[in-house]
């Protein structure tokens, strides 16, 4: 399974022989799966990306990015996806290894609280904007590539998490972090299934 952020990348993955393609919309938290073209070019939203990838490749398409509940799952399936991939939806779950500060910031974040930056790891990633990210971006300094930059900054982020210094932390999150719900992963999965079924029934009514 490969990740594509554009139809061009999806076609390249199909040519390489993958079994399925994850269509990663720009809303997705974490590192971008882009691998063709200059950084920052492939910021296509999920609603625009999924149907174009579905039409471009003869492979199962898995939608990822900003899907947080059953409504998002139903929408992705309506766009032609055969499955979904959720990450931020489980960020505040009981099993999540994110720090309490990270969970709190993500759950309380506004829809414009994240940014895509390479300053912390050397690779574009969507994370909660912090004073550290702002300062690094304003500095104009050249950022080493991944993974050296990640190795250089990780000790700072880990120490900041231990001291509850969120202004110095690197907190990955999608654009809909406020929709993340706490609890055991089992219960979250069951709720997602119920919500998706209900949303699909509403669409079919």
Which residues are covered by each model-predicted region?
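Active-site glycine- and acidic-residue-rich loops that bind
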Residues: 1-12, 67
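A cross-family glycoside hydrolase active-site/sugar-binding cleft signature
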Residues: 1-3, 24, 62-64
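Short, ordered loop/turn segments at secondary-structure junctions
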Residues: 5-6, 25-27, 89
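Generic hydrophobic/aromatic pocket-lining and core-packing "Φ" positions
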Residues: 7-10, 18, 50, 73
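A structural preference for short, pocket-lining loop segments at secondary-structure junctions
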Residues: 10-26
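Conserved active-site-proximal phosphate/metal-binding subdomains
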Residues: 31-62, 67-205
């Amino acid at each position: 399974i490969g990740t594509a952020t554009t139809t061009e990348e999806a076609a390249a993955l199909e040519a390489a022989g993958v079994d399925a393609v994850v269509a990663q919309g720009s809303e997705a938290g974490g590192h971008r799966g882009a691998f063709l073209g200059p950084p920052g070019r492939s910021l296509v939203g999920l609603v625009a990306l999924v149907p174009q990838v579905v039409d471009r490749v003869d492979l199962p398409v898995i939608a990822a990015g900003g899907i947080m509940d059953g409504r998002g799952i139903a929408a992705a399936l309506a766009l032609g996806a055969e499955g979904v991939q959720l990450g931020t939806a489980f960020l505040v779950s009981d099993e999540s290894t994110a720090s309490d500060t990270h969970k709190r910031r993500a759950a309380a974040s506004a829809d414009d609280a994240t940014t895509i930056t390479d300053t912390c790891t050397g690779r574009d990633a969507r994370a909660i904007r912090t004073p550290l990210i702002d300062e690094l971006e304003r500095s104009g300094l050249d950022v080493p590539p991944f993974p050296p930059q990640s190795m250089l900054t990780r000790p700072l982020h880990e120490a900041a998490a231990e001291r509850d210094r969120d202004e110095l932390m690197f907190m990955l999150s999608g654009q809909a972090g406020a929709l993340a719900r706490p609890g055991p992963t089992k219960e979250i999965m069951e709720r997602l299934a119920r919500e998706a079924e209900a949303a699909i029934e509403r669409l079919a009514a």
